[in-house]
Every structure is written in structure tokens, then in C-alpha cells.
């Protein structure tokens, strides 16, 4: 298959894909890969296969095609293509919750010589890196990466990238419990979709609605949460977007749990868990198990809650997500306290405080924890976060966290 025919077939696949005939599109692209001798065409079709498998939640397949794409980029001896293929490799690992690998591949991207693609893709590299740091609960570096990605988006008038970064920032602030910002950023993403997104994939609308649903639930606005989640789920079902379907099911389950309707919550947690296990979203499985554990606690079935916590803890440690570990130790602590088991209680108290230290989830000005309850937060230019009230009361010209770490004794 020559260059022109390859190009034709790739376009045919794209048209099928955009009209939701995904399996037919995959067949066309796979045939191109088998028959085409045109390296440029092969590189492009591998990019299409990476994106399609990502949206379907077939992350192991996505990773496989990303690896082949790197080999093709090396054959082409082009730094632009190499950057693009390393970014796809980083994203594949991000989806599989291999966050340390993601960060490593993103650093490889940033270390490549300055290229035309570097200007276009630098923001996406920073976004993927931020998502990976967030997956590891390294909050300062996550925020630093997101802000860098946002600067790329603004400097290049890239509204699509800005939309994705706003969704990630929504997730960031939901985790550190500044619910006002957790809602502000996905609302900003939805506004970008309305203003610029006529020709965009509907997944951007679905993504912003999902993150709005999460924030509304945390704020106790359960009707609005349900409305946004239903809209997101509708698009996810239309497009066969399995990863988003799983997230919506998890959000529905959390909404029903918040309403005290445990009968309805349990099967939704099970469905979310089933899809997340199938696609390999281990962090999503941790969140589903945490929700299940909270349901069992509400029913006073403490041993069943501890079973769910144990499974979640294993996964959270495997993935390296410190915030989930912290939440699980906190829940275990309250269970063992009510059971009157002092030895187990003490062990979880110790681990809980270790996790707080590791995540640096405390305000460097007042010393109180961050992320325990909803409070307004503010980041300094170094991306360390503090209670807004503390910054207003104390006023700070330099970051106390940075000051402290620079004073730590080093090895000479």
C-alpha cells in the first residue's frame, strides 16, 4: 500500500470513528498497519489506534501501539515524531496508573531537543505529568505542572488543552477539599466547550459535566450533581467511552450514598468496580472500594468494611496513591476505635500521621491539616498551598515551606 492509498484509508477510518463506527474504523486502521510500507502513514495510523484504544479503555492495547510508534519514530529519525510517540507512551502508562513511568517518559519528552512539536505538545506533556503527580498525591508538583500546562494553553490560544487542564484542576481541588475551586474549574471548562467547542469531540463536554457532578456532590448539591452526571453518562454511552462510564457510575454511587440510599449505591459501586477492573484503572477501584467500605460502616457491618478497606489498601500501595492510603487509615482508625481494639487503632493512627507528612497536607502557616474539611485554599507562586485565611492574616513574602526545606541539613 503506497502513500496516497495509506492517506485515503486513514481518512476513511477517521470518518468511521467520528460517526461512532469504532470497530469498523479499527479494522481499516489495522489493515493499513499490516499492508502499508509508508513510514509516515504508519506513524499516523498508530497515533489513531492509540487514541481510539484510550477512549475505549483498552489501555494495554494502547500501550502496545505506543511502543510500536516509538520504533517507527526512530526509523523516521525525526525529533517531532519521537516527542509525540513518547507522549503517547507517557499517557498509556498514566491510564494504567503506572505514575512513576509516566513521569519518567514526560521528562524524556521535555529533554528532547527543541522542536516544532515541542511548542504544540509541551502543554500536553505538562498536563500528563501533573496527572501522574496527582496520582501519587505529590500535590505541589502536580499543581506546578498544571499551571505550566495552563500557561502553554494561554500562550498558544489552545482552548482544548485549557479545557482538559481545568478538569484536572477540578480534580486536584476536590482532593485537597477546596470545593469552591473544585467547582470553578470544571465550570470554566464547560464555558470553554460552549464558546469554542462546536467542532470538538463531545467527550470534552462529557468530561466537564462529570467533574462538575463530583464538585456538586461534595458541596451537597445532589440534584445538580445527578443532572450533570446523567448528561456525562449519556455521552459516554453514545460513544462507548468505558472509562467515563465507570467514573459516572462511581459518581452516581457516591450521590446515592450521600443521600443515605445504600440499596441503590451498592450495585453502582459494583458496576463501576467491574469496568475499572476490566480496563485496569486501579485508582478508580480504590475509590469504589472506599465508597463500599463507607456504606458498610453506615450499616454497622464493620468486618465487611474492613475487608473492603484491606483490598483498597493493597491497590493504593501498589499504585502509590498516598491520599487514598491516608483516607483508608483514617476510616480504619474510626472502626477500630468503635471496636475498642487499641493495638490496631494505634497502628493506623501512626500510619495516618506518616501519610499526612508524606503528602505535606498541612498548612505551613498554622500547622493545621489541609484536606480534612472544605476550606478555601491559595497557592503561592512556588505551588505550595495554604489556607487562604492564613495568607490573608499573616501576609507572606516568601513561602514558609520552601524556607523550611532550604534549611534542612544536607550531606556535605
Swiss-Prot record:
Lipidation positions, renumbered (N-myristoyl glycine): 2
Cleavable signal peptide: none
TPR repeats: 6-39, 83-116, 123-156, 163-196, 206-239, 246-279, 286-319
Modified residues (Phosphoserine): 405
Positions annotated as zinc finger (RING-type): 363-403
Pfam families according to UniProt: Rapsyn_N, TPR_8, zf-RING_2
GO molecular function ontology, one term from the record: zinc ion binding
Positions bearing Phosphotyrosine: 196
Keywords: Cell membrane, Congenital myasthenic syndrome, Cytoplasm, Cytoskeleton, Disease variant, Lipoprotein, Membrane, Metal-binding, Myristate, Phosphoprotein, Postsynaptic cell membrane, Repeat, Synapse, TPR repeat, Ubl conjugation, Zinc, Zinc-finger
Biological processes per GO annotation: chemical synaptic transmission; establishment of protein localization to postsynaptic membrane; motor neuron apoptotic process; neurotransmitter receptor localization to postsynaptic specialization membrane; positive regulation of motor neuron apoptotic process; positive regulation of neuromuscular synaptic transmission; regulation of postsynaptic membrane organization; skeletal muscle acetylcholine-gated channel clustering
Record localization: Cell membrane; Postsynaptic cell membrane; Cytoplasm, Cytoskeleton
Main location: membrane
Superkingdom, natural source: Eukaryota
Presence of keyword Ubl conjugation: yes
GO CC annotation terms, alphabetical: centrosome; cytosol; Golgi apparatus; neuromuscular junction; plasma membrane; postsynaptic specialization membrane
Its membrane topology: Peripheral membrane protein
Changes after translation: Ubiquitinated by the BCR(KLHL8) complex, leading to its degradation.
Domain notes: A cysteine-rich region homologous to part of the regulatory domain of protein kinase C may be important in interactions of this protein with the lipid bilayer.
Disease per UniProt entry: Myasthenic syndrome, congenital, 11, associated with acetylcholine receptor deficiency: A form of congenital myasthenic syndrome, a group of disorders characterized by failure of neuromuscular transmission, including pre-synaptic, synaptic, and post-synaptic disorders that are not of autoimmune origin. Clinical features are easy fatigability and muscle weakness affecting the axial and limb muscles (with hypotonia in early-onset forms), the ocular muscles (leading to ptosis and ophthalmoplegia), and the facial and bulbar musculature (affecting sucking and swallowing, and leading to dysphonia). Fetal akinesia deformation sequence 2: A clinically and genetically heterogeneous group of disorders with congenital malformations related to impaired fetal movement. Clinical features include fetal akinesia, intrauterine growth retardation, polyhydramnios, arthrogryposis, pulmonary hypoplasia, craniofacial abnormalities, and cryptorchidism. FADS2 inheritance is autosomal recessive.
Family: Belongs to the RAPsyn family.
Protein role: Postsynaptic protein required for clustering of nicotinic acetylcholine receptors (nAChRs) at the neuromuscular junction. It may link the receptor to the underlying postsynaptic cytoskeleton, possibly by direct association with actin or spectrin.
Protein name per its UniProtKB record: 43 kDa receptor-associated protein of the synapse
